[in-house]
Amino acid sequence: MARYIGPTCKLSRREGTDLFLKSGARALDSKCKIETAPGQHGQRRGRLSDYGVQLREKQKVRRIYGVLEKQFRGYYKEAARRKGATGENLLKLLESRLDNVVYRMGFGATRSESRQLVSHKAISVNGKTVNVASFQVAAGDVVAVREKAKNQLRIQSALNLAGQRSNVEWVDVNTEKKEGVFKRVPDRVDLPADINENLIVELYSK
């Protein structure tokens, strides 16, 4: 299954909520009417079955983190093997992805841009270049923009945008050095309340 490269607004409209796929340079405006489904006239949102609700929640989370279906299912299986609540474990695995940590630290304006930085070898972890977006960052790891990429305008622009939103508590960023420490894996209370991971567990448990 290929990665989606079409309009990000369309995905937010499909899920009926802002998936934060845009940079935040401008808010989702009247041109992106997330209250109506995609289509020239906006498809009517019918009443969903229990399965439909579970599927939509899975698609929403998958699209927020930019993960393809096969990989997402792999994360679920790993989450189920670990001790604790499967849904919470799933979110922790997604939050620990390198591309997501780069985004949380503000080096990329979106997770998609952060994924590009990783794949273009602009990011290091503990001093070593890592170009795998799914790399699992551990507590205490130092994530930094490599010297060759520090002058990229898009990185400085992303940091400026990040300064306009509230900082997350589980990363500590030095904007001058363009590096940060992943202090800990976030707890469930740290993450968005509008994600219902239990619906995903119910979907995959069938």
Swiss-Prot record:
Q: Does the keyword Cell inner membrane apply?
A: no
For this chain, one GO molecular function annotation is:
rRNA binding
**Pfam families (UniProt xref):** Ribosomal_S4, S4
Q: Where is the S4 RNA-binding domain?
A: 96-158
State the superkingdom.
Answer: Bacteria
Alphabetical list of InterPro entries matching this protein: Ribosomal_uS4 (IPR022801), Ribosomal_uS4_bac-type (IPR005709), Ribosomal_uS4_CS (IPR018079), Ribosomal_uS4_N (IPR001912), S4_RNA-bd (IPR002942), S4_RNA-bd_sf (IPR036986)
| PROSITE patterns, per the entry | RIBOSOMAL_S4, S4
Q: List the disulfide bonds.
A: none
Record keywords = Ribonucleoprotein, Ribosomal protein, RNA-binding, rRNA-binding
**Which NCBIfam families has this protein been placed in?**
PRK05327.1, rpsD_bact
Name of protein: Small ribosomal subunit protein uS4
Which organism's genome codes for this protein? Cellvibrio japonicus (strain Ueda107)
Protein's gene: rpsD
